Amino acid sequence: MPFISQKGDDACLSVRVQPRSSKTGIAGRYGDQVKICLKSAPVDNAANKECCQLLAKTLGVPRSNVSVMNGQTSRSKVLKVEGMTPSELRKALAPVLGDESEAGA
């Protein structure tokens, strides 16, 4: 999965955010990124907060473990997931992205 990388001991995820969507959720792949749809508008950091909350809930980690590393004001972002390796992140995202070969690994 080209959208997952490593920064120190933590995993990083490259995402493409679509704010003001009709519903919040992970929409699948978008090139070499994961597309995330958010109801929030990109005002007062609301979309970034919602994005981190969604990813934390999806991965089953505390919200404080997920942060925006790059792209605070851009649709393309890099999110850091503390305490999770890239392989753990791959396994956790596989069912959501429909990649069964990774889910069973």
Swiss-Prot record:
Entry-linked SMART domains: DUF167 (SM01152)
Coiled-coil intervals, chain numbering: none
InterPro entries assigned to the protein according to its UniProt record, in alphabetical order: DUF167, YggU-like_sf
NCBIfam families xref list: DUF167 family protein
PANTHER family for this protein: UPF0235 PROTEIN C15ORF40
Name of one Pfam family that matches: DUF167
Gene3D superfamilies per the UniProt record, alphabetical: YggU-like
Organism, scientific name: Chlorobaculum parvum (strain DSM 263 / NCIMB 8327) (Chlorobium vibrioforme subsp. thiosulfatophilum)
Gene Ontology CC, one term: cytoplasm
Family: Belongs to the UPF0235 family.
Protein name, as recorded: UPF0235 protein Cpar_0370
SUPFAM superfamilies from the UniProt entry: YggU-like (SSF69786)
Organism domain of life: Bacteria
